[in-house]
């Protein structure tokens, strides 16, 4: 039975609730309050998210910084270890030299004393080597005082040697807080002390004295002092089981240093085998250099058919030659990847990867295959350790030292300068606060050796690079605008109107509807040859009609899938898109329009005749072989004698053309494909380089320049880079300049030399002023303004071609000051007079 509620309680509440519900409405104040609460909630949530994001960024930054410090500590361990070993070895070498000198002095003194005694007393019979006479008495030869003095000296020497080595370790342990830059300076100084350049008193090569450190099996030449230093650096890495990168500038003899290192290893009793892996085009040079400098060391060119390579594999394990050692195996990247299963079972004493920047992509097959090779030591040879971004440099370091360089994201996030959107002042402030670039220099110190031509004071004339901005011609402007607007196809398709065939009903016929006489086809259509023979006459008749009906006025090369390539072709020459054809001869139309339709050709047409008149020889590089074809037409038009080199030519043709250019004074221009002629050729007969179109990778153009700016060049070299202003051509150059800036910051020209070379020992960090100069450096020193009608005036042309200051500098034998000059051609109105600003 339910409990009874108190009287009067329920009756009074129910009417009140009903009344409240009847009168409840949503007022504007309530709506405003709801909106305010919602806005406050969103603001509170936004602040929480912002706080969480800032906290996460701070924590992630701290985590990455700790990883960076850990990487630096690991690199410090290598540096300190190398330094300790090198200083110990230096002390041991010094002790050995002192002992030899004392022994020589004692022999001289003893010889003089014996000669005096011989004149007064009877001659003393010499004793045989060994311990045959047990009654041998030392007192017969030396007095008691001499014995005691020698024993005392030996005891003191042993104590000094032990204490010095102990003190070295204690000193090294006490200096754990040393920065890697100080270690680098000590390391460099130790290398210099170990390689003091003095000549062997006995050995000579072609009448010239040989450096004392040059290996005895290196008999084909005399090593330069910086090559001896490089060999000593490689020796230190090899003796301590550390891999490295030899990144000397092109033309300094990286191949010679490697050959000398292998000869030194053989001299130390290492029988091999050794493996050299590189591009196919470099293999003949490796074989020739080994034969030239170390003829006693056996080599093997591992190439050929599969059966031939199977026989060669068995010969790797056989000892050959007068030295009875395993051969130096030289092979290409492709063969190394294909025969990895056979080659990876060999225990290579030394693995050299030539053109090491080929493994800049850590995901490529080549780096995966090479990592499986069993090698005691690995060495990468590259003149361009940093080409595009830091991930490429990290890929090289990861291949050599996977235990040290194992975190790409942290490495790249800290050091990728191209990802920074801050101004130069912000970058400098960040560098002052965190010293990131300084840390990177410290980390790379033990593993990278890079010297420039200016560092080693070679007899190489100065070089200047000049960038010339060319305008667009009227035809180029039309094509360029049409390509950007994607209407270029209409320009060539509108004139070719297709004849429309109508059906009996008045509608256009479908293209697939063709009258076919099936009675001519047998009942067995599987006979394919018979079917083709029956249809072919009809196809030939249709083709003949098409060829007659369409007049050939020009050759059109239009591929709309790659707009960027079309824009580049338009900047180079509009004939790459549409080359006019002479209607009479049906050959390419070569006349003055070939020059006037391209802004770059207008520049060339002003420069080349004057260069020829002054006795210069020109290398003209282009990325496109089709562009070389048009340049050949221009040379025929102006009666310029020329040679050519591209990737499609055979080895004999290349040799013939290079010999012709280097020896024949009448050959004025050498047309070269940048990629085909960028490596392995010597064209020092030229003193002028013209880069017609720049590469996205600035190192490709630098390699091209070094074909003539190298050892053996006797004249100053000027490099002209042609750029079409305000186009994709200029964007490519600017992008390449950004990559060069990254290289200048990371692979600093005052670091990784293997010597101090004027470095301040107390300078531990990058100078902010120096960093600002790198970030805000101007790439030009002159501007020339002119109208389109006259691209370059006579006065400006004289400034452009003048190299008298370089000649004076070379004759004075003063320090070569690197300069960058740009002649910038700007479009002005016709009434504006040319102006020259300095």
From Swiss-Prot:
| Organ and tissue specificity | Highly expressed in proliferative tissues such as adult thymus and testis, and expressed at lower levels in uterus, small intestine, colon, and peripheral blood mononuclear cells. Also expressed in neoplastic cell lines including those derived from myeloid and lymphoid leukemias.
> Which residue ranges does the UniProt annotation give for the motif DEAH box?
354-357
| Upregulation | By concanavalin-A in peripheral blood leukocytes.
Q: What is its EC number?
A: 3.6.4.-
Annotated residues for binding of ATP:
248-255
Q: What does this protein do?
A: Plays an essential role in normal development and survival. Involved in regulation of the expansion or survival of lymphoid cells. Required for de novo or maintenance DNA methylation. May control silencing of the imprinted CDKN1C gene through DNA methylation. May play a role in formation and organization of heterochromatin, implying a functional role in the regulation of transcription and mitosis.
- Protein name as catalogued: Lymphoid-specific helicase
What organism does the record attribute this protein to?
A: Homo sapiens (Human)
């Amino acid at each position: 039975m339910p409990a009874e509620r108190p009287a009067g309680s329920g009756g009074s509440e129910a009417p009140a609730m009903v009344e409240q519900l009847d009168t409840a409405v949503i007022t504007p104040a309530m709506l405003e309050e709801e909106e305010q609460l919602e806005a406050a909630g969103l603001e509170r949530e936004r602040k929480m998210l912002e706080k969480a994001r800032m906290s996460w960024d701070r924590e992630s930054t701290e985590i990455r910084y700790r990883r960076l410090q850990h990487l630096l500590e690991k690199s410090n361990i290598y540096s300190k270890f190398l330094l300790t070993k090198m200083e110990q070895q230096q002390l041991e070498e010094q002790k050995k030299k002192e002992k030899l000198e004392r022994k020589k002095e004692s022999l001289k003194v003893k010889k003089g004393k014996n000669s005096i005694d011989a004149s007064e007393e009877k001659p003393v019979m010499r004793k045989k080597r060994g311990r045959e006479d047990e009654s041998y008495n030392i007192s017969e030869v030396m007095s008691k005082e001499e014995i005691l003095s020698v024993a005392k000296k030996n005891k003191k020497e042993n104590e000094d040697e032990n204490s010095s080595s102990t003190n070295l370790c204690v000193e090294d342990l006490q200096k754990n807080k040393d920065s890697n830059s100080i270690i680098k300076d000590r390391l460099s100084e130790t290398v210099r002390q170990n390689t003091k350049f003095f000549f062997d008193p006995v050995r000579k090569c072609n009448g010239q004295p040989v450096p004392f450190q040059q290996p005895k099996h290196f008999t084909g030449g005399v090593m330069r002092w910086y090559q001896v230093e490089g060999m000593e650096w490689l020796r230190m890495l090899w003796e301590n089981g550390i891999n490295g990168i030899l990144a000397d500038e092109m033309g300094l003899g990286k191949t010679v240093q490697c050959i000398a290192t292998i000869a030194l290893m053989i001299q130390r009793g290492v029988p091999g085998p050794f493996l050299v892996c590189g591009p196919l085009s470099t293999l003949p040079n490796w074989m020739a250099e080994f034969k030239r400098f170390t003829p006693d060391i056996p080599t093997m060119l591992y190439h050929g058919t599969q059966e031939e390579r199977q026989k060669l594999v068995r010969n790797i394990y056989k000892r050959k030659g007068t030295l009875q050692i395993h051969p130096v195996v030289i092979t290409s990247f492709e063969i190394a990847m294909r025969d990895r299963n056979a080659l990876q079972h060999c225990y290579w004493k030394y693995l050299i990867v030539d053109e090491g920047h080929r493994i800049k992509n850590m995901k490529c097959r080549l780096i995966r295959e090479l990592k499986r090779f069993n090698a005691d030591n690995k060495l990468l040879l590259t003149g361009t350790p940093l080409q595009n971004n830091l991930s490429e440099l990290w890929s090289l370091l990861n291949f050599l030292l996977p235990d040290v360089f194992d975190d790409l994201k942290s490495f790249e996030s800290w050091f990728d300068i191209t990802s920074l959107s801050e101004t130069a002042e912000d970058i400098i402030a960040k560098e002052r606060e965190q010293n990131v670039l300084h840390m990177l220099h410290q980390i790379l110190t033990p593993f990278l050796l890079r010297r420039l031509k200016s560092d080693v004071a070679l007899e190489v004339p100065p070089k200047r690079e000049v960038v010339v901005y060319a305008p667009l011609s009227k035809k180029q402007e039309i094509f360029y605008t049409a390509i950007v607007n994607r209407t270029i196809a209409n320009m060539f398709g509108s004139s070719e109107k297709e004849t429309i065939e109508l059906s009996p009903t008045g509608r256009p016929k479908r293209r697939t509807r063709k009258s076919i006489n099936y009675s001519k086809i047998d009942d067995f259509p599987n006979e394919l040859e018979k079917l083709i023979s029956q249809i072919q006459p009809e196809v030939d008749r249709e083709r003949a009609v098409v060829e007659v009906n369409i007049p050939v006025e020009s050759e059109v090369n239009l591929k709309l899938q790659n707009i960027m390539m079309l824009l580049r072709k338009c900047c180079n020459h509009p004939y790459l898109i549409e080359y006019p054809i002479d209607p009479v001869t049906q050959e390419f139309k070569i006349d003055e329009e070939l020059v006037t339709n391209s802004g770059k050709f207008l520049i060339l047409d002003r420069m080349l005749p004057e260069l020829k008149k002054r006795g210069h020889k020109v290398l003209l590089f282009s990325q496109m072989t089709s562009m070389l074809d048009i340049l050949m037409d221009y040379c025929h038009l102006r009666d310029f004698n020329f040679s050519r080199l591209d990737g499609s030519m055979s080895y004999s043709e290349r040799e013939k053309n290079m010999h012709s250019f280097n020896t024949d004074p009448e050959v004025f221009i050498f047309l070269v494909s940048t990629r085909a002629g960028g490596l392995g050729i010597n064209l020092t007969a030229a003193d002028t380089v013209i880069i017609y179109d720049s590469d996205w990778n600035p190192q490709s153009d630098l390699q091209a320049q070094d074909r003539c700016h190298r050892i053996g060049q006797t004249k100053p070299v000027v490099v002209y880079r042609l750029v079409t202003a305000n186009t994709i051509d200029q964007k490519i150059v600017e992008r390449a300049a950004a990559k060069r800036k990254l290289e200048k910051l990371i692979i600093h020209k005052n670091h990784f030399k293997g010597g101090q070379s004027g470095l301040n020992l107390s300078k531990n960090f990058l100078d902010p002023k120096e960093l600002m100069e790198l970030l805000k450096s101007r790439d030009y020193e002159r501007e020339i303004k002119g109208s389109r009608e006259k691209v370059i005036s006579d006065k400006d042309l004289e400034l452009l071609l003048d190299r008298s200051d370089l000649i004076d500098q070379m004759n004075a034998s003063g320090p070569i000051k690197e300069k960058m000059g740009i002649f910038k051609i700007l479009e002005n109105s016709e009434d504006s007079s040319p102006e020259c600003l300095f």
